[in-house]
Amino acid sequence: MNKKLLFSFLAFLGVVSVKAQRNELGVRLGMSNLVGDVGRTNYILQKPLDLSRASDWGIPFYGGLLYRFNFNPHQTVRLDLGYNQIQFSDKAAKEDYRRNRNSYGKNNVYEASLMFEYNFFPVNNEQISMLSPYIFGGVGALMFDAPKATLVNDFRRDADGVAQAPINELDFTTTTDYSLGKKVTMHIPFGVGLKYKFNHSWAIFAEATFRYTLTDQLDYSKILSKDVKTSFNADILDPATGGSLLQSGNYYAVSKEREAEFIKKRNIGDDRSNDWINTFSLGLTYSFGRPPCYCE
């Protein structure tokens, strides 16, 4: 008897969930741009940097997938997964100090966002030829490339490459090796759009998305101290420690001073403001599942 009741209850839940189901799957294509400490500062629809070098730079592209669950004709929860290729170059900036600085680069940014969407008109109803503006906002995560560096401390060398003992604590070289590593941060996406339902199951939309990120590293303008490593050549050892002479005493103190000076000179821009990624996109969605019963 208990098994029959359990089966009946589960079947009832299944019927309710099917009747309440109204899903949309879609794709979005568009263009993304960065607003940060390097490059242009207009918030949307920045031009590609140099189409003649598209084979090297690519284009500032956005591509994504989305899923919508419509609670009623106006309210929707949606999940976005996307890829942004963003570019930035001080040569394209309006500010003289940026053009004189001439920093540049590109970044590959992957995103996942969960958002609430509100349609001003009942575009999620069954009827076709419905048009509605909408607003949305939520939270999400970004995975991006961030700068890293290794400061290589080495002895001065003679013409044959043989390490020379330092004559004082400043008599050694420090060079920098740069690299990129993946990082994850949060972002706050929001925006506006316009949705047109031209068929019982199909709709097109256009939207502008603004993402306030919780990082200042998307344009490589900032490197964190934890991302700066040091290495020490061990051709000459300290008899007391058995390690590199450059890792002992005043040599090590000088290496730390050089590390701090490197970080200070390497970081540019306003470290009190974070970066934005903004996108203008066009999309197409397909609705499936039985229409919900929007009961009063």
PLM segments and residue spans:
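Residues on the lipid-exposed face of transmembrane beta-strands in outer-membrane beta-barrel proteins
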Residues: 27-31, 65-69, 114-118, 137-141, ...
